[in-house]
Amino acid sequence: MKAQAVQKLDLAGCQAQLLVLLEEQFRLRMQHATGQLAKTSRLRTVRRDIARVRTAITVKKEAHS
């Protein structure tokens, strides 16, 4: 997910996207632990997407305060 796409989301959308990404990260970690994950680079991209969304949430909360 690109930073521009995250910035277009509202606060509720960002929080919903964060939950989706955290669930995906959990599934990927479990697949990696059991040796079923083919694209291990996906772990890195999901982790970075989570960071982007969390940053956007912080910025949006500070803007509303």
UniProtKB/Swiss-Prot annotation:
PROSITE patterns: RIBOSOMAL_L29. GO terms for biological process: translation. It holds the Pfam family Ribosomal_L29. InterPro entries: Ribosomal_uL29, Ribosomal_uL29_CS, Ribosomal_uL29_sf. Coiled coil: none annotated. GO terms for cellular component: ribonucleoprotein complex; ribosome. One of its GO terms (molecular function) is structural constituent of ribosome. Keywords: Ribonucleoprotein, Ribosomal protein. Belongs to the universal ribosomal protein uL29 family. This is Large ribosomal subunit protein uL29. It comes from Acidithiobacillus ferrooxidans (strain ATCC 23270 / DSM 14882 / CIP 104768 / NCIMB 8455) (Ferrobacillus ferrooxidans (strain ATCC 23270)). The lineage of its organism: Bacteria, Pseudomonadati, Pseudomonadota, Acidithiobacillia, Acidithiobacillales. The gene is rpmC.
